[in-house]
Amino acid sequence: MASFINNPLTSLCNTKSERNNLFKISLYEAQSLGFSKLNGSRKVAFPSVVCKAVSVPTKSSTEIEGLNIAEDVTQLIGNTPMVYLNTIAKGCVANIAAKLEIMEPCCSVKDRIGFSMIVDAEEKGLISPGKTVLVEPTSGNTGIGLAFIAASRGYKLILTMPASMSLERRVILKAFGAELVLTDPAKGMKGAVSKAEEILNNTPDAYILQQFDNPANPKIHYETTGPEIWEDTKGKIDILVAGIGTGGTITGTGRFLKEQNPNIKIIGVEPTESNVLSGGKPGPHKIQGIGAGFIPGNLDQDVMDEVIEISSDEAVETARTLALQEGLLVGISSGAAALAAIQVGKRPENAGKLIGVVFPSYGERYLSSILFQSIREECEKMKPEL
């Protein structure tokens, strides 16, 4: 293990509150700039901006008093920690560190884009609370990310989702007040998208956020996720592994990291059963959140150096192993990303390198899915001891 591994990789910022304010500031400062401008003509020194900002436009009483209290739930988004994988990574010649998006306020990486897409549309004057009806197709996590932001800002939200997604997703979405329309699971995300467009056309004052094509999706990862990984690894990351759903995470994060170091390798993950990025055909699979069955507009394939295929069964088994061996309760797509990272970590040419892997969502929202089916059935059969 490389010598730097022995030292904790801590943030340059003093408090989580400080870092979360910066998440909010960096997004607002960039609203008027297109993603291409951020990536091209304007050079943004993200490590210094993200870590050492010393002023904010206005300060609440809690900030003035020095209390470490967020002003609202949106300030809790981002700045998630990284942790090394240990037992499960035995046999790897590289070191693997997971970016724990499971520790977002609503437990998934989609909290970032739920916030960014709504704020971006507000700043452009396209939506307003109490008037606009937000509409979006989702596999669940983006819907949840939108639902808690919509609830906190006063929007009505209508979501379309394939009926194959977990029961927990339905419950959470409705708990936040979202209206949920289930679609034919055989049609996958394409069916959910089609239904959302139908609702949009028949609903007054409706606005669709279009996570698969909205530039605010990859932009927030370029502004926050990428800089966070770069900062927390002290720029020592060699390889990034991430699943491909909307394409936002891998595009925005990968683009930022490659700007810092062009030698960093960006590796995407897709289901074997729906391997469209590898030249295959779309098909049903069990890895919720990735493998939409089409190439999303937000995905910049030029950012990626490689795409690895992981089967549903492999992803499920790896996610279960992460809970048992690492104490990390994660979703199926995290299992897919972890296995891909482990495969890359065993390649001889990667000896001593640092691999970052994104764990997109928390496992508790998969309790009714195949991921924990055997455990659930066992628990349902349990009887009290008399």
From Swiss-Prot:
Pathway annotation: Amino-acid biosynthesis; L-cysteine biosynthesis; L-cysteine from L-serine: step 2/2
GO BP of this protein: cysteine biosynthetic process from serine; double fertilization forming a zygote and endosperm; pollen tube growth
Sequence positions that bind pyridoxal 5'-phosphate: N141, G245, T246, G247, G248, T249, S333
NCBIfam families named in the record: cysK (TIGR01139), cysKM (TIGR01136)
UniProt family annotation: Belongs to the cysteine synthase/cystathionine beta-synthase family.
Residue range of the transit peptide in the UniProt record, numbered on this chain: 1-52
Keywords tagged on the record: Amino-acid biosynthesis, Chloroplast, Chromoplast, Cysteine biosynthesis, Plastid, Pyridoxal phosphate, Transferase, Transit peptide
Cofactor or coenzyme needed: pyridoxal 5'-phosphate
Reaction(s) this enzyme catalyzes, per UniProt: O-acetyl-L-serine + hydrogen sulfide = L-cysteine + acetate
Name used for this protein in its record: Cysteine synthase, chloroplastic/chromoplastic
